[in-house]
Amino acid sequence: MSDFPPLHVVITGGGGDLARAIAAALPGDTVHAPPRTELDVRDETQVDSFFAKLPRVDVLIANAGLTRDGALVNLSMADIDEVIATNLRGAFLCTRAAIKLMMKQRSGHILLIGSRAGKHGTRGQSAYAAAKAGLVGFGQSVAKEYGSRNVRCNIVLPGFLETKFTAHVPEKRLAEIREEHVLGRFNTPENAARAIAFLARLDHVSGQVFTLDSRMDRWT
């Protein structure tokens, strides 16, 4: 990547395993990866203030997310609101703030970290799946709205990663998910991060959904 000019990159949810791996995969770039304690993506005032202090943003990686698992009838509205606010509203707020800078620059790239759950649904994750599905429509709308300003927006599905985010998944379920992969193994945060770092510099692609694991869908 040394042949490319350095980028100013913002990664939300900076305390997570994937965010740290992405930051490590971008050596030579200026990376801002604030954890939730420094940037609560649900807070409009906090988000706008954070981005207003930055001289430029070449790449926004909207990675902040959480899940509250359980059958729909057992989910409280507080659970549902928190999942939607973090995964979807947070992406809206950060994208809106970043685009204001990117339009002035006449260049920028937004990568929304989605999930396979947003394409196929997942038992016990209705709120999470709904939020991640929303990212696809949101991201493709942004791509259409701001393509004329040379601002790109793509959605990345990193696949199932064994991180602290998924540490609660029972071993039996892990085995079932692993069997869905034609390679018989999960992505690592480092594998996903290398792909995301590569995508970050693509200047000719927008409005696409990139799947990074080895699960196959019909008509892909």
Label each region the model flagged:
Residues 95, 131, 139:
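Active-site helix of classical SDR
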Residues 71-72, 79-84, 166, 177:
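Substrate-binding pocket helix/loop in short-chain dehydrogenase/reductase
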Residues 147, 152, 205-207:
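Short, small/polar-rich loop/turn modules that mediate ligand/substrate recognition or access, typified
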Residues 100, 144-148:
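Alpha-helical segment proximal to the catalytic Tyr-Lys
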Residues 120, 206-220:
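Short C-terminal tail/terminal secondary-structure segment
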Residues 92, 185-212:
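C-terminal substrate-recognition "lid" of short-chain dehydrogenase/reductases
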Residues 115:
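Residue(s) in the substrate-gating loop at a strand-loop-helix junction
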